[in-house]
């Protein structure tokens, strides 16, 4: 596990964008795993800037998003489908049929999960997987207690995640969906060739310390990343402040 400490959020975004840019320049038909939430927004802004500068061509790139709320249509303003189009896809030259986001509004959620898992497998896995981390150590919607053998599946959101995400729903936790489709931990670990985890802010400091330096435990789902052979953590100073060491290999 390699840990990079960024001086500030803007540097975090530039460092992570550089990894993606290098991957696409090396392999035009790269497969990217993407995340939502506030942390990757700056990364996507940087990628848009690089695209507009002619430094990245997304025309052959394929993407898979980590997760999606159950019960929200793709056009719902708080759906992750809407988020991704607003913050990235509508600003770059992605082919629409190369964009994959779990179908949260599919009445057959279990079947949709299997289809999604199969699509990732058929794509040959994910070259670079972007992850955020929850204050409770979750990755995707794999909450504490999630089995490390889980594949893409329907998950129940924890109360802490519902409260954390309420800010996207006008501050009202009642409006936050209780279920979501998420890549499972096994999916992420097995299919991702390079995992890039982003963390910003002091509210992530405990999770980052436990993820990197604590025991591997389902109580901290992100701790399983210690077992992956190619992980880059990019954290700003506030998120990294509780690490005992910033040098890992």
Swiss-Prot record:
Keywords: Carbohydrate metabolism, Hydrolase. GO terms for cellular component: cytoplasm. InterPro entries: Glc/Gal-6P_isomerase, Glucosamine6P_isomerase, Glucosamine6P_isomerase_CS, NagB/RpiA_transferase-like. HAMAP family: GlcN6P_deamin. The active site is at 67 (proton acceptor), 136 (for ring-opening step), 138 (proton acceptor), 143 (for ring-opening step). This is Glucosamine-6-phosphate deaminase 2. The lineage of its organism: Bacteria, Bacillati, Bacillota, Bacilli, Bacillales. It catalyses: alpha-D-glucosamine 6-phosphate + H2O = beta-D-fructose 6-phosphate + NH4(+). Disruption phenotype: Deletion of the gene prevents nearly all growth on glucosamine and severely reduces growth on N-acetylglucosamine. The gamA-nagB double mutant cannot grow on glucosamine or N-acetylglucosamine. Catalyzes the reversible isomerization-deamination of glucosamine 6-phosphate (GlcN6P) to form fructose 6-phosphate (Fru6P) and ammonium ion. Required for growth on glucosamine and also provides the majority of GlcN6P deaminase activity during growth on N-acetylglucosamine (GlcNAc). The keyword Cell membrane does not apply. Gene3D superfamilies: 3.40.50.1360. GO terms for molecular function: glucosamine-6-phosphate deaminase activity; identical protein binding. GO terms for biological process: carbohydrate metabolic process; glucosamine catabolic process; N-acetylglucosamine catabolic process; N-acetylneuraminate catabolic process. Pathway: Amino-sugar metabolism; N-acetylneuraminate degradation; D-fructose 6-phosphate from N-acetylneuraminate: step 5/5. The gamA and nagB genes encode isozymes of GlcN6P deaminase. Its EC number is 3.5.99.6. Induction: Part of the gamAP operon. Strongly expressed during growth on glucosamine. Expression is repressed by the HTH-type transcriptional regulator GamR. Belongs to the glucosamine/galactosamine-6-phosphate isomerase family. NagB subfamily. SUPFAM superfamilies: NagB/RpiA/CoA transferase-like.
């Amino acid at each position: 596990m390699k840990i990079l400490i960024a001086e500030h959020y803007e540097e975090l975004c530039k460092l992570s964008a550089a990894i993606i840019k290098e991957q696409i320049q090396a392999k035009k038909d790269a497969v990217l795993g993407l995340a939502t939430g506030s942390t990757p927004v700056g990364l996507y802004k940087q990628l848009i800037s690089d695209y507009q500068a002619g430094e990245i061509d997304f025309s052959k790139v394929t993407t898979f998003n980590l997760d999606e709320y159950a019960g929200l249509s793709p056009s719902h303003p708080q759906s992750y489908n809407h988020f991704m189009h607003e913050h990235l896809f509508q600003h770059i030259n992605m082919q629409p049929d190369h964009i994959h986001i779990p179908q949260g509004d599919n009445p057959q959620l279990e079947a949709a999960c299997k289809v999604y898992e199969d699509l990732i497998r058929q794509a040959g896995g994910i070259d670079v997987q972007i992850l955020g981390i929850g204050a409770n150590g979750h990755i995707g919607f794999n909450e504490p207690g999630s089995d490390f053998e889980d594949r893409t599946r329907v998950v129940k959101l924890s109360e802490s995640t519902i409260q954390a995400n309420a800010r996207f729903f006008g501050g009202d936790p009642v409006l936050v969906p209780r279920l979501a489709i998420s890549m499972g931990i096994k999916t992420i670990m097995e299919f991702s060739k390079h995992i890039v985890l982003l963390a910003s802010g002091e509210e992530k400091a405990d999770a980052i310390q436990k993820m990197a330096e604590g025991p591997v435990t389902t109580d901290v789902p992100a701790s399983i990343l210690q077992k992956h052979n190619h992980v880059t953590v990019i954290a700003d100073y506030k998120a990294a402040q509780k690490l005992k060491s910033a040098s890992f290999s």
